[in-house]
UniProtKB/Swiss-Prot annotation:
The lineage of its organism: Bacteria, Bacillati, Cyanobacteriota, Cyanophyceae, Acaryochloridales. It comes from Thermosynechococcus vestitus (strain NIES-2133 / IAM M-273 / BP-1). Keywords: Cytoplasm, Hydrolase, NAD, One-carbon metabolism. This is Adenosylhomocysteinase. InterPro entries: Adenosylhomocyst_ase-like_sf, Adenosylhomocysteinase-like, Ado_hCys_hydrolase_NAD-bd, NAD(P)-bd_dom_sf, S-Ado-L-homoCys_hydrolase_CS. Its EC number is 3.13.2.1. It comes from the Bacteria. It catalyses: S-adenosyl-L-homocysteine + H2O = L-homocysteine + adenosine.
Amino acid sequence: MVSSPIKSEAPVRHDVKDLSLAPLGQQRIEWASREMPVLRQIRDRFEKEKPFAGIRLAACCHVTTETANLAIALKAGGADAVLIASNPLSTQDDVAASLVVNYGIPVFAQKGEDTATYMRHVNIALDHRPNIIIDDGCDVVATLVKERQHQISDIIGTTEETTTGIVRLKAMFRDGVLTFPAINVNDADTKHFFDNRYGTGQSTLDGIIRATNILLAGKTVVVAGYGWCGKGTALRARGMGANVIVTEIDPVRAIEAVMDGFRVMPMLDAAPLGDIFITVTGNKHVIRAEHFAVMKDGAMVANSGHFDIEIDLATLKTLAKQVRVVRNFTEEYILPSGKSIIVLGEGRLINLAAAEGHPASVMDMSFANQALGCEYLVKNKGQLAAGIHPIPAAVDQEIARLKLQAMGIAIDTLTPEQVEYMNSWTSGT
């Protein structure tokens, strides 16, 4: 289902855990491709048209089977691409190995890499002197702007996958340091309506269940944040029988949560009630000392935002008299009172630390946006102003049409009479 593997006795440059894992990785990459028909069609076109011929590309993404299919599509389009991980715990080592061995794509990523290694890989990506950066959280672009100003002249543009990354890019633009175009993949309709909501909702609970093997039915789950990721997480938790509480700082989203049937209250009020806490805010220290102090014994905390700062783990470590690993990706922090707080996935993305991330079907649309966003940058080289640009509406609509077609679903089209009515102001009551 994916491009034919490259036969190579001398693998390309890499820093992966174990190349012998490549056969398993290849099987899983091909399996994911079955659920990614839109990206397959784009890859087939790229292979013929080579839109990225002569383009150096650095991708900072979660190294999963779905990302592998994006990387393969970009390479098919002629890109000279390198791939690094966007999170120290999200790499699937068999996938990284397969991309190196079977597809000839340089990969620098290992599950469990420390922060120093992670940043070394970021700099390796920039050593590639990319013309296009695919970013997931804005670490590569931020490093470029802070430390590699001399390379900015090489840049055609960047694409950004996440809410967190878009927040950082907006701050960079306000500060006058974003001097090239950035494509906002996150806010494409075919991305956040599906990836953020259905992908995050399913994969977050998958990660929690894999890490703990708990029954969600009857538990009180506190979801911090009611953006698209929070909506999906709350929806799926309720669907599995949990009693869901939502915490918010935005009054509009709080009203949404109430009218969607959830209890809404401040985190300090929710803290004594919750059995499981899930942060999906993109902000810092959403759960902190005052909340740990009133939580139940055995309360579990997990993060499905981008960075590991939503839960104040540094403070929790200072409060704990002992920390012990009780299961894979599950640590027990024992407080002087004897009460325990259970931290899942080291406070990093639980859906990628303990599970496999979003299902391929939703990532099909997200990565179609990434692929076409990169093509849009190349086609419009030198014509886009510095700053943040949306995915063109026509691209968004085309991705949706291709997805429906692949699902065997047909929809109506406007009649000529309806088109005329929608473009007229003369018809009224």
